[in-house]
Regions:
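A solvent-exposed interaction/effector surface
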Residues: 1-160
Length: 160
């Protein structure tokens, strides 16, 4: 498992991003099915990952006490009007502002170690304060579009 250092984290000002959101609420064991629905909807809407950024916004712990409490938003950046096409899709925004950014290269299926590094190690030592928006990631490239060792995700911890 990769270990992270303060040199891996940069503070970046990010612009607000309008997104289409498919919410996953409930047992993480069913997340794969939600992801497949999201991919199918996204293809039908013409929002290809190369031209429309992909985000995950984690609204719960990775393993909440009750699986029913698991919550993540699957998002795609778009300025287009949202066509739900029979899916539960809503418009939203990832707010802009200062963020601590940590890039993860390789297997990006489990970003929990990187998120825990930001919260438990980097944040207390940095003198920064977290803002009132959950940690999220932008998936810059992902398997199977690229070989697994070339997958890239950036975690964003919103700061005050």
């Amino acid at each position: 498992m990769k270990t992270f250092t303060t040199d891996d984290v940069m503070i970046r000002d990010v612009a607000p991003t309008r997104v289409a959101i498919m919410e996953h609420r409930g047992d993480p064991a069913t997340l794969g099915a939600t992801i497949q629905r999201f991919i199918a909807w996204r293809k039908a809407a013409g929002l290809h990952p190369r031209t429309s950024p992909t985000f995950n916004v984690w609204r719960s712990e990775r393993r909440p006490a009750s699986p029913a409490d698991y919550s993540v938003d699957l998002c795609v950046g778009t300025d287009q009007p949202i066509e739900a096409n029979g899916e539960q899709i809503k418009a939203g925004e990832i707010p802009g502002g200062r963020c601590a950014v940590l890039r993860v290269v390789g297997n990006t299926d489990n970003l929990e170690p990187a998120a825990l590094y930001l919260y438990r190690d980097w944040l207390p030592a940095s003198g920064e304060e977290a803002r009132d928006f959950p940690i999220y990631c932008q998936r810059l490239s992902f398997f199977p579009e690229v070989p697994e060792h070339e997958a890239v995700a950036e975690l964003f911890l919103p700061l005050k």
